[in-house]
Amino acid sequence: DLQCAETCVHSPCIGPCYCKHGLICYRN
């Protein structure tokens, strides 16, 4: 539940991060 630097609007999240709300990348 920590916000990652990248977003997932135009590309998928990187590494341990997952896409939330189709907008912001989060990790545990």
From Swiss-Prot:
Tissue spec. comment? Expressed in root nodules but not in seed.
Q: Which UniProt keywords apply?
A: Disulfide bond, Knottin, Plant defense
A Pfam family: Cyclotide
The answer on whether this UniProt entry bears the keyword Glycoprotein reads no
UniProt KW Phosphoprotein keyword:
no
Question: What pairs make up the disulfide bonds?
Answer: 4-17, 8-19, 13-25
| Posttranslational modification | Contains 3 disulfide bonds.
Crosslink site: Cyclopeptide (Asp-Asn): 1-28
**For this chain's UniProt record, which GO biological process terms are given?**
defense response
Superkingdom of origin organism: Eukaryota
Its biological purpose: Probably participates in a plant defense mechanism. Not active against Gram-negative bacterium E.coli ATCC 700926 or Gram-positive bacterium S.aureus ATCC 12600 up to a concentration of 100 uM under low-salt conditions.
Instruction: Print the domain comment field.
Output: The presence of a 'disulfide through disulfide knot' structurally defines this protein as a knottin.
Q: Which family does it belong to?
A: Belongs to the cyclotide family.
Protein name (record): Cliotide T21
